[in-house]
């Protein structure tokens, strides 16, 4: 896989152990060779924002508002406990069975000439999860594409373009409020992502929309720790579609593994 400044974020966050990133914001973790972590103010100043003004952490995870960013910072810098599905207040952050079978979305006409690439990649990326769990159905509603924003209440989420982002794509979790439920895609970076196909990149992002965290937040990865708000579903899988390759991952193309399939099936049937 060729070296590039922007990594799947699928992100330009600077993990100190990652050779794929040359610049980026400070991490809230202790830096090698030091006894200090950055202050919240330092962390806040160095955290990127997306066009909607949301902070982007852990590569492709949006956080709305300074108070929520502070909660995230404190969770990362506080004591690690044994608490990979996202959790909110100790509960799995997943869709209800009925909603999981009706995950409607639109693809914005603003993608222009690149729209068909996104439509096709969303369909094939969604298909990877749907084939693994009978309780999941992503439903494309093209009639909503002309008004495809988070304000459209006719769909669960929107897929919209972004330019000059510090990530290839970013998504949301089931617990996100409706104004935050969109998948943003930088098409130029998506098309230049090397071994990471558009299908696999968008499947990774759709994994987040189903409630799945980055696999490398687990201690077995040895780097790129994010926080403790998760529950393991399967044994650690360094080749997971949810594992950044630059965080001691063993997959070069973000393909889905059997452990990924078993994990999603354990939640969505």
Regions found by a protein language model. Give the residues of each.
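Secretory targeting and sorting signals
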Residues: 1-29
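Short, conserved helix/loop micro-motifs enriched in His/Cys and acidic residues
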Residues: 96-111, 179-191, 240-245
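Residues that cap or initiate secondary-structure elements
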Residues: 61-67, 111-113, 144, 163, ...
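Disordered inhibitory propeptide/activation segment of secreted metzincin zinc metalloprotease zymogens
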Residues: 29-117, 229-234, 266
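Divalent metal-coordination and catalytic microenvironments
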Residues: 105, 129, 204-207, 242, ...
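Extracellular (secreted or membrane-anchored) zinc-dependent metallopeptidases
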Residues: 226-269
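Metzincin-family zinc-dependent endopeptidase catalytic domain
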Residues: 116-235
């Amino acid at each position: 896989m060729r070296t590039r400044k922007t990594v799947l974020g699928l992100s330009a966050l600077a993990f100190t152990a990652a050779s794929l990133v040359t610049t980026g914001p400070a991490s809230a973790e202790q830096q090698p060779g030091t006894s200090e972590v950055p202050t919240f103010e330092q962390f806040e100043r160095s955290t990127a924002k997306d066009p909607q003004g949301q902070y982007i952490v852990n590569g492709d995870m949006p956080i709305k508002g300074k108070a929520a960013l502070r909660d995230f910072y404190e969770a990362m810098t506080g004591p690690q406990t044994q608490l990979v599905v996202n959790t909110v207040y100790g509960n799995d952050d997943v869709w209800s069975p009925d909603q999981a079978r009706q995950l409607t979305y639109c693809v914005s006409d603003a993608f222009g000439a690149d729209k068909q690439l996104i439509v096709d990649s969303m369909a094939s990326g969604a298909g990877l999860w749907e084939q693994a769990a009978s309780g999941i159905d992503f439903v494309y509603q093209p009639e909503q594409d002309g008004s495809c924003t988070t304000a459209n209440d006719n769909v669960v989420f929107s897929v919209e373009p972004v330019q000059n982002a510090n990530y290839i794509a970013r998504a949301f979790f089931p617990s996100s409020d409706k104004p935050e439920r969109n998948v943003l895609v930088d098409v130029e970076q998506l098309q230049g992502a090397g071994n990471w196909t558009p299908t696999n990149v968008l499947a990774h992002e759709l994994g987040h929309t189903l409630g799945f965290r980055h696999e490398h937040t687990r201690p077995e990865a040895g780097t790129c720790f994010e926080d403790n708000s998760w529950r393991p579903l399967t044994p650690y899988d360094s080749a997971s579609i949810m594992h950044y390759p630059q965080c001691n991952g063993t997959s070069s193309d973000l393909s889905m593994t059997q452990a990924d399939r078993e994990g999603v099936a354990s939640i969505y049937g």
